[in-house]
């Protein structure tokens, strides 16, 4: 895949450069981040997004806190509060804590987290490519822009295309932030993969017509039974795929599994500003003063999953047993 990475670290400058994903695909603009406070705001504002990419960014946020002389407890608190649903954020910050007060150790650990993301996603892509075929539908954005590596669901799709297994991709636009239209379409175009953009409401009709052979999505947080949170709209796709007898897969690094959660009932769901629903890039699309509701994620019950694609292979039901084994909890 011709990757456009969401960030880069300029160690000599003490600056973490973030690709402002709000401005894609029209502009590729990198913005400088010099403190943990700025990193937390960038994550909250979705300059960077996607669970693995948020985790890497948060880790480097703690490096920046050392460089800027910020209070480390406060920096950690701000970063944890930036996006509550993606568990990678918390895992990364937990790993950085033993290196508080140690700049060199902190930088080494942040780089290690980033390298592990790349290695893990290369494996996810290989495993996922073996089970995808024909025409695949995906939701939101799960490529390098969302991860800092090779991508999860999108990485598997691109690898499956390279192997001649997938011939075409249906891309949900993913309202209201349009990650599918702005980011997934952008990445697939760069990778040379044949794809077509659809509105979210078209998915069921495509399935009914036999135009979808499989659905694969990413994961922001998964419980031990396989219930998972992903971009809002995922649950509806899972129900539709189940109704039409279409395989439905979730692709994720095992770091996105929260071993503290027995089911999806305990996953916190971020609610974002209603303004993101009624307006986009300064253009209002609903009457002034009209109310809107904006949960950023929904939870899909594990019963709708055909399989879970991880760096250790593809897991099949019963998912609780497979996930516990993969995590080394048994």
Curated annotation (Swiss-Prot):
According to its UniProt record, which residues of this chain constitute the active site?
220
Q: Which Gene3D superfamilies match?
A: translation initiation factor eif-2b, domain 1, Translation initiation factor eif-2b, domain 2
Q: Name one Pfam family in it.
A: IF-2B
Show the catalytic activity.
Answer: 5-(methylsulfanyl)-alpha-D-ribose 1-phosphate = 5-(methylsulfanyl)-D-ribulose 1-phosphate
Instruction: Give a yes or no for keyword Zinc in this entry.
Output: no
Which Cys-Cys disulphide bridges does the record give?
Answer: none
Annotated pathway = Amino-acid biosynthesis; L-methionine biosynthesis via salvage pathway; L-methionine from S-methyl-5-thio-alpha-D-ribose 1-phosphate: step 1/6
Write down the position(s) of the site called Transition state stabilizer: 140
Q: Which residues form a coiled coil?
A: none
The Enzyme Commission number assigned here is 5.3.1.23
Q: What class of enzyme is it?
A: isomerase
List GO BP terms, alphabetically.
L-methionine salvage from methylthioadenosine
Q: Which UniProt keywords apply?
A: Amino-acid biosynthesis, Isomerase, Methionine biosynthesis
UniProt binding sites for substrate:
49-51, 83, 179, 230-231
Citing just one GO molecular function, the answer is: S-methyl-5-thioribose-1-phosphate isomerase activity
Role summary:
Catalyzes the interconversion of methylthioribose-1-phosphate (MTR-1-P) into methylthioribulose-1-phosphate (MTRu-1-P).
Q: Which family does it belong to?
A: Belongs to the eIF-2B alpha/beta/delta subunits family. MtnA subfamily.
PANTHER family referenced in this protein's UniProt entry, alphabetically: METHYLTHIORIBOSE-1-PHOSPHATE ISOMERASE
What protein does this entry describe? Answer: Methylthioribose-1-phosphate isomerase
* Organism from which the protein derives: Thermus thermophilus (strain ATCC BAA-163 / DSM 7039 / HB27)
List the taxonomic lineage: Bacteria, Thermotogati, Deinococcota, Deinococci, Thermales
């Amino acid at each position: 895949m011709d990757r456009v990475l969401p960030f880069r670290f300029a160690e000599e400058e003490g600056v973490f450069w973030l690709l402002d994903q709000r401005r894609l695909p029209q502009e590729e603009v990198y913005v400088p981040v010099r403190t943990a406070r700025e990193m937390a705001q960038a994550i909250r504002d979705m300059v960077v997004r996607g669970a693995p990419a948020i985790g890497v960014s948060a880790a480097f946020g703690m490096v920046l806190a050392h460089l800027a002389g910020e209070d480390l407890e406060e920096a950690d608190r701000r970063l944890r509060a930036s996006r509550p649903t993606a568990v990678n954020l918390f895992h990364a910050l937990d790993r950085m804590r033993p290196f508080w007060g140690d700049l060199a150790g902190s930088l080494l650990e942040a780089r290690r987290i980033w390298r592990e993301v790349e290695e893990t996603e290369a494996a996810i892509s290989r495993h996922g490519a073996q089970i995808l075929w024909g025409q695949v539908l995906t939701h939101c954005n799960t490529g390098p822009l969302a991860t800092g590596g090779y991508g999860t669901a999108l990485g598997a799709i691109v690898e499956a295309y390279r192997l001649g297994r997938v011939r075409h991709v249906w891309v949900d636009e993913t309202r209201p932030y349009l990650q599918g239209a702005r980011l997934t379409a952008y990445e697939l175009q760069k990778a040379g993969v044949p794809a077509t953009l659809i509105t979210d409401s078209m998915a069921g009709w495509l399935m009914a017509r036999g135009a979808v052979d499989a659905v694969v999505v990413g994961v922001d947080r998964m419980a031990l039974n396989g219930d998972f949170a992903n971009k809002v709209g995922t649950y509806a796709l899972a129900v539709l795929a189940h109704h039409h007898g279409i395989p439905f897969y979730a692709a994720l690094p095992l770091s996105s599994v929260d071993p503290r959660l027995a089911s999806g009932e305990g996953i916190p769901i971020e609610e974002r500003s209603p303004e993101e629903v009624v307006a986009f890039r300064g253009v209002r699309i609903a009457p002034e003063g009209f109310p809107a509701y904006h949960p950023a994620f929904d939870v899909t019950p594990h019963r709708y999953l055909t399989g879970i694609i991880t760096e250790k292979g593809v897991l099949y039901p019963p998912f609780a047993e497979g996930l516990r084994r993969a995590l080394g909890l048994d």
